[in-house]
């Protein structure tokens, strides 16, 4: 059964995308669809360009060829003011959390509201408390970032990401560096916020278990190509050796354990003085 996402149902559509850094081809003519109201995951090993894809979707980088549309708008043809308006509708949870260290939890969440709206402080207070309540940290509003655990900081960053009620959120490695309890809390939050707020979520991750638990659809990327795509169940049953190696964490396979080198015995017996 083919469960591929129809472009008609997509909030974000990536068509025939190619992108390089220097001589390294990051994406080679790939196409992806991100369905409205769903959680879509981009998976693959480190260095495959997952975070780069988020930057391309956000208009921070320009593709060599292809197009990216968000809510029907071609991201890379927008004027600066139009791109600015679009970005206000796109929440972002950075891998680092990126909290402003000299601001309290409350002021971190209030920051986008103060920057991008003309709401009175009384309404901003109400909205901030609502967002903090949603992530379970309303009682931490007066703490400073250096008083937070890693999991708490990630949840505060999520509250800030939804402050402007975006249509979508992009998550850059949300589970990295988190303990099992924090991972479980983030899994619950991402799924529940997506459902309750009607969000479209894009998750970049190499954490297989957590991501598969909440994703509606998964793309697996390697060496610039999509090597697997489908529902978590379809990915689990994929006959691709590469997908199976990634999902099971096997040490060797299509992604080799050894970095390319000349023959081992020849290398040992070589009389060359160069390493």
Protein language model annotation of sequence segments:
Residues 169-172:
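Catalytic Walker B motif of ABC-type/P-loop ATPase nucleotide-binding domains
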Residues 248-275:
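ABC ATPase nucleotide-binding domains
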Residues 163-167:
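A short, proline-enriched helix->beta-strand linker immediately N-terminal to the Walker B motif
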Residues 144-148, 152:
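Conserved ABC ATPase signature
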Residues 73-74, 121-139:
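Conserved ABC ATPase "signature" region
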Residues 58:
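Helix-to-loop junction immediately C-terminal to a conserved catalytic motif
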